[in-house]
UniProtKB/Swiss-Prot annotation:
It comes from Anoxybacillus flavithermus (strain DSM 21510 / WK1). PANTHER family: RIBOSOMAL PROTEIN S19P FAMILY MEMBER (PTHR11880), SMALL RIBOSOMAL SUBUNIT PROTEIN US19M (PTHR11880:SF8). This is Small ribosomal subunit protein uS19. The keyword Ribosomal protein applies. Protein S19 forms a complex with S13 that binds strongly to the 16S ribosomal RNA. Signal peptide: none annotated. GO terms for cellular component: cytoplasm; small ribosomal subunit. Pfam families: Ribosomal_S19 (PF00203). It comes from the Bacteria. Belongs to the universal ribosomal protein uS19 family. One of its GO terms (biological process) is ribosomal small subunit assembly. Keywords: Ribonucleoprotein, Ribosomal protein, RNA-binding, rRNA-binding. NCBIfam families: rpsS_bact. GO terms for molecular function: rRNA binding; structural constituent of ribosome.
């Protein structure tokens, strides 16, 4: 179930303040965050945000297509290495 429309999209205040500060000064630097739950706003476009995946910070460059999605969608938390291969030939 999605978020109620009357509430509007969510973004952590500390992250929004950092983005607004960079937009005012015109700087482009990597912003490190643990806030995977924050929605990407149009003000984020062009910035690189390092999102924590539980082990390291994954740099995510924000483009126009990402607006409306959550930051956590672009930093996967699980690494899939494939299922164990069948060794039918070696068992015989």
């Amino acid at each position: 179930m999605g978020r109620s429309l009357k509430k509007g999209p969510f973004c952590d205040d500390h992250l929004m303040k950092k983005i607004e500060k960079l937009n005012e000064t015109g700087q482009k630097q990597v912003i490190k965050t643990w806030s995977r739950r924050s929605t990407i706003f149009p003000q984020f476009i062009g910035h690189t945000i390092a999102v924590y995946d539980g082990r390291k910070h994954v740099p995510v460059y924000i483009t126009e297509d990402m607006v409306g999605h959550k930051l956590g969608e672009f930093a996967p938390t699980r690494t899939y290495k494939g299922h164990a291969a069948d060794d039918k030939k070696t068992k015989r």
